[in-house]
Swiss-Prot record:
It comes from the Eukaryota. Expressed exclusively in decidua. Belongs to the somatotropin/prolactin family. This is Prolactin-3C1. Its main location: secreted. It comes from Mus musculus.
Amino acid sequence: MQLSLTQARTWKGLFLLVSCMFLWVYVTATRYDRKSNEEIYDNLLSSSRHIHRVAKKMYKILDSKLTEGVCFRNKNTKMCQTISTHSVKKNEDLLKVIINVSNFWTYPLKMLIPAVLTHLDSDDGMMTRAVELNYGNKVVLEGAKALLSRIQPGIEENNEPDRWSDLRELRSSKKSKHLLAFCKFFYCLRKDTKMVTCYLRALKHGKIKTIC
């Protein structure tokens, strides 16, 4: 039986997502218990830098090829939901910020995959990049939790993050709406992953007073 183009794309997306989930479950189950804090920081920095580069690349592709500069010109795409860091004084405070930021992006990145599959799959490997973002964010989240548990054993986790306010537009069948939603998504993700990378670097080198 020959699959239609839509069916083939759907199966492709499901295969990539399931593969990513199995890899993440295996890696996170074995990664942190045998590693030093420095090794974990190195791993998280690598993952955070990678997802920042991927988000930056996706934003660039979207702005230059799909929206012809609309991303850059539209001020609404640069209004992000931010997390306050004014009370950061200790390592555990900074780790909590990293956890909150990564946790905030967990659901939006999960929903990004079907949205990209529907609207952007044919453009420059966007589907593969969406899966990479989803996986990389989970690596950072679980690693930051592992580090925090070593500093504050038994700490309760925040399992109810705020939801991304533009997910409905991301799924919209109207091209102008979902493209602008993608612009905002990648711009804000790029901004937040840059912040997380900076905080991880500050933690690794013990320079919290000079963070970004």
